Amino acid sequence: MIKTITYITTAFKEGYVPPGALDWSDADDNNAFHAKQIVIDLDATLSTELAMYHDQEKYDDAVTLGLPNDNAGRPIPSLLGISGAFIPKGAKNPEAAKDFVRYVIQPNVAGEYLKAGLGRWLPAISDIVKNDPWWLDPKDPHRLAYVTQGVLGNTVPYHTVYNPGWAEANAAQIWGQAHANVIRNNMTPQVAAEGALKRIGDILAKYPITQA
């Protein structure tokens, strides 16, 4: 953790990261890429690329790649988030809502729905991409790389599936605050790491999980 915080904050201090990055909102990494403030955007969808979809020259000029290998030369599994539907308990017509969800999650329907979004989000069912050549069409190298990484490649779920406390810790932006403490408050990476880990530990302690 100390090495990671040191690496990230040093890159900022040496001018490799836009000064405004400490105050970015959710879409500002995309905006910075399009404004040519950064050359790499680590994004979970194809939103950055698809913003250039109707500008063929810009679309073709960008490159989508998977994660690099780790220090031992082994592939790094990709963190994969899953979005789901929910039906509020107070819904006026829950049975109709359930019927709609059952309809949407059919592989052929889900596939067409996601294709209408130009593949910005990945199918949760691998057979969708295996049975429809559109998903792996080499004519669109962005989508091909994205699907290969997120559907056909090695993935692991976000930590929230193991303990709900991770959602609270993530919402608190603990690691971002640790980086900001080093950059703005001259805190050492070691002190920042210790504080972040303690805060995460305090949050997770509120969600004990009994081992079976």
Identify the residue ranges that each predicted region occupies.
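Short, charged, surface-exposed loops that flank catalytic or proteolytic processing sites
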Residues: 181-196
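Glycine-centered hinge/linker elements that transmit conformational signals in sensory
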Residues: 1-22, 67
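Alpha-to-beta junction loops
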Residues: 34-44
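Short, low-complexity disordered leader/linker segments with a strong preference
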Residues: 198-212
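Short helix-initiation/N-cap motifs at beta->coil->alpha
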Residues: 20-34
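A structural supersecondary motif
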Residues: 62-71
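C-terminal lobe and pocket-closing loops
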Residues: 46-58, 71-177, 211
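Regular secondary-structure segments
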Residues: 9, 172-184
